[in-house]
């Protein structure tokens, strides 16, 4: 595939917690940052240790700045050039995904990838030339129980729809997308949205995220008439969890089922993309994968941060996370710079500014710098002239001159004053509108860092130290490889048959160990598959309960003929991921709104409403006594459902 590049995958291991130490759990995961390797060891002697290699590995003592500069900085740099970029944190619940993405606000060194990206973006803008104009917009959403919610909206519990257009791609309809002028405003919006996000306590995490969150930064830039648009998606996924460990019940259990289902779909998408033989990628099976469609196998530069815990009692979940991460390394994306995109707002604002300036120029031609002063001077001249006329008029009135000329002058004076007031008001509106739009656009070279200047400096210093250490590491690695090559050459020179036999024995032992590892790998895959099947069965049992409850409610409260009517006129929409009603304009509520009020058909002292009154009034339904409990169609459907569920 031309221009394709693989998804970058990094692994971060959190420190072992005090609770885990008190419970006697040991460390099962060791990280080698230099070799970019993660080693996981089981308590069972039968299972050999596993080693996985990634694009970068962060041990428990790695600081937030290093994580940002290694994993996130290259993505943000590309977004500023006009590419799409995605950074998402994946892993078991309680492994530090939210800390990696958001971190703590204070001290500055503890901030995560999202706030650090704010400082990076505006530091870049401040260093650009004055001939480059920027427009920065943000959005913040969560996917809670398969419902998309706008975290920046006052009504953050509303369910939004996913739409798709050929010129724009996948987007969320009616999602708030405010413009920002500095990093402080971005930080304030992130904090506001984070407060609206769904969190809850479980046995594994007191502040467990109960939803997937997606913070998106859209950066448009214009230089020499060319508009580019980069989109940065920062995703904090909810963690996979087992009910036996989290102790989730009731609402928490329902949330966990939805989270596991969407993460299972994400795993299926990754598997299908890596397989290469799959003709269908199941993006539409969940709203999460639908929104990540470009990030996985599409037009985006993507980094996956796999978060793991070090304790032995999380061995199975950690191994599963590492397997998914190892598989994701083979996903290929084809990223391209977005030039003159259809949904760019920067061009629209520039045209609006030109139109407003043209109107202001017509009012008072001249240079932009002196235009406002000249207009104000002109207004003052008119006011002085009017003041002179007012004095003359007052003298005429005081001298008791009350002829037609005086009335004409009074009328003219009032019209001039109204005209002057209107001109000043319209000018102020135009000027205010122009300033408001210009404020949204950011000119390169302006210092917009404000309070985050210290943060930007820390990132820059850390990045320079990182580059220097990489250079030294590369130099040392070259020396090590040279010495290793010499050593291998010496070892391969057999001085006797005994040495040759010794080397052959080593090779046999190596192959034997590889065979042992392969068998253990197969065993782990079988166990992992069994765990996935058990998790799916748990989800099916939970969904079965909800389904039976809904069926019981329908049987008890909705007449059968109306159920059949509903079934006849509904169809499943793959695009919306929901049931759609045909001819919705002719449904009861819409028709009732335009119909005259219905006559009252009953009268009793206690004002109770008979059961199914609304159905009889609107559609002439049969009474409960003469209505059969079930129809043949529904009866057959119930039998099929019972067979499926049992």
Swiss-Prot record:
Organism from which the protein derives: Caenorhabditis elegans
Kinesin motor domain mapped to chain residues: 6-331
Annotated coiled-coil segments of the chain: 342-552
Annotated Basic residues bias: 629-638
Record note on quaternary structure: Component of the kinesin II motor complex, a heterotrimeric complex composed of kap-1, klp-11 and klp-20. Interacts (via C-terminus) with klp-11 (via C-terminus) to form a heterodimer. Furthermore, within the heterodimer, the C-termini of klp-20 and klp-11 interact to form a coiled coil (stalk) or tail domain, and this is necessary for association with kap-1, and kinesin II motor complex activity upon IFT cargo binding. Prior to cargo binding, the klp-11/klp-20 heterodimer is autoinhibited by the tail domain of the heterodimer, which folds onto the kinesin motor domain.
Family the UniProt entry places it in: Belongs to the TRAFAC class myosin-kinesin ATPase superfamily. Kinesin family. Kinesin II subfamily.
UniProt entry tagged with the keyword DNA repair: no
Site (May be required for autoinhibition within the klp-11/klp-20 heterodimer): 444-445
Chain segments carrying region Interaction with klp-11: 525-550
Protein's gene: klp-20
Purpose of the protein: Component of the kinesin II motor complex (composed of kap-1 and the heterodimeric motor proteins klp-11 and klp-20) which is required for intraflagellar transport (IFT). Heterodimerizes with klp-11 to form a 'processive' molecular motor upon IFT cargo binding, which, within the kinesin II motor complex, binds to and moves along microtubules in a unidirectional manner (without dissociation of the heterodimer), and in turn, is responsible for the IFT of cargo.
GO terms classed as biological process: anterograde axonal transport; cilium assembly; intraciliary anterograde transport; microtubule-based movement
Protein location: Cell projection, Cilium; Cytoplasm, Cytoskeleton
Regions that span the bilayer: none
Record protein name field: Kinesin-like protein klp-20
PANTHER family according to UniProt: CHROMOSOME-ASSOCIATED KINESIN KIF4A-RELATED, KINESIN-LIKE PROTEIN
MF GO annotations: ATP binding; ATP hydrolysis activity; microtubule binding; microtubule motor activity
């Amino acid at each position: 595939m031309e221009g394709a590049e693989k998804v970058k995958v990094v692994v971060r291991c959190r420190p072992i917690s005090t609770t885990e130490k008190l419970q006697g759990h040991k460390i099962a995961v060791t990280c080698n940052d230099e070799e970019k390797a993660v080693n996981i060891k089981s308590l069972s002697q039968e299972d050999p240790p596993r080693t996985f290699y990634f694009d970068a590995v962060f041990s428990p003592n790695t600081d937030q700045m290093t994580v940002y500069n290694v994993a996130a900085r290259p993505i943000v740099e590309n977004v500023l050039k006009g590419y799409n970029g995605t950074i998402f944190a994946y892993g078991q619940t309680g492994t530090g995904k939210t800390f990696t993405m958001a971190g703590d606000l204070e001290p500055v060194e503890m901030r995560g990838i999202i706030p650090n990206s704010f400082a990076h973006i505006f530091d870049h803008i401040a260093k650009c030339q004055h001939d480059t104009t920027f427009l920065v917009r943000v959005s913040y959403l969560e996917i809670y129980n398969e419902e998309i919610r706008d975290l920046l909206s006052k009504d953050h519990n509303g369910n939004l729809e996913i739409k798709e257009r050929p010129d724009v791609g996948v987007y969320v309809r009616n999602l708030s997308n405010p413009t920002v002028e500095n990093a402080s405003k971005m930080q304030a919006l992130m904090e506001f949205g984070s407060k609206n996000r769904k969190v809850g306590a479980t046995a594994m995490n007191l502040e467990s995220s109960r939803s997937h969150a997606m913070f998106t930064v859209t950066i448009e830039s214009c230089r020499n008439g060319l508009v580019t648009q980069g989109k940065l998606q920062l995703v904090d996924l909810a963690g996979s969890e087992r009910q036996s460990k989290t102790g989730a019940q009731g609402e928490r259990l329902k949330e966990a089922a939805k989270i596991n289902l969407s993460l299972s779909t994400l795993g299926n998408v990754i598997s299908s993309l890596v397989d290469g033989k799959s003709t269908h990628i199941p993006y539409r099976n969940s709203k999460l994968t639908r929104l990540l469609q470009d990030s996985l196998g599409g037009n985006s530069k993507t980094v996956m941060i796999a978060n793991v815990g070090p304790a032995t009692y999380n061995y199975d979940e950690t191994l599963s996370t590492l397997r998914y991460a190892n598989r994701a390394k083979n996903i290929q994306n084809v990223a391209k710079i977005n030039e003159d995109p259809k949904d760019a707002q920067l061009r629209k604002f520039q045209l609006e500014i030109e139109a407003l300036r043209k109107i202001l120029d017509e009012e008072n031609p001249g240079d932009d710098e002196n235009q406002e002063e000249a207009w104000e001077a002109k207004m003052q001249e008119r006011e002085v002239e009017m003041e002179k006329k007012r004095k003359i008029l007052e003298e005429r009135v005081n001298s008791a001159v009350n002829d037609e000329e005086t009335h004409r002058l009074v009328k003219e004076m009032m019209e001039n004053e109204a005209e002057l007031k209107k001109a000043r008001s319209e000018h102020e509106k135009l000027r205010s509108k122009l300033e408001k739009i210009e404020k949204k656009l950011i000119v390169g070279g302006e210092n917009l860092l404000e309070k985050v200047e210290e943060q930007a400096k820390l990132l820059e210093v850390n990045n320079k130290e990182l580059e220097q250490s990489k250079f030294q590491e590369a130099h040392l690695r070259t020396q090590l490889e040279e010495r290793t090559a010499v050593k291998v050459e010496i070892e391969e020179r057999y001085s006797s048959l005994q040495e040759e036999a010794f080397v052959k024995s080593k090779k046999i032992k190596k192959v034997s160990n590889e065979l042992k590892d392969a068998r253990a790998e197969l065993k782990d895959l079988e166990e992992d598959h069994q765990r996935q099947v058990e998790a799916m069965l748990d989800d099916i049992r939970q969904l079965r309960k909800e389904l039976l409850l809904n069926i019981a409610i329908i049987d008890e409260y909705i007449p059968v003929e109306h159920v059949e009517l509903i079934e006849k006129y509904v169809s499943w929409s793959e695009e919306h991921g929901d049931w759609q009603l045909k001819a919705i304009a002719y449904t009861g509520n819409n028709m009732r709104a335009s119909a005259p009020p219905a006559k009252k058909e009953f009268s009793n002292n206690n004002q109770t409403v008979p059961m199914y009154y609304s159905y009889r009034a609107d559609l002439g339904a049969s009474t409960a006594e003469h209505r059969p409990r079930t129809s043949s169609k529904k009866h057959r459907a119930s039998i099929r459902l019972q067979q499926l569920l049992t």
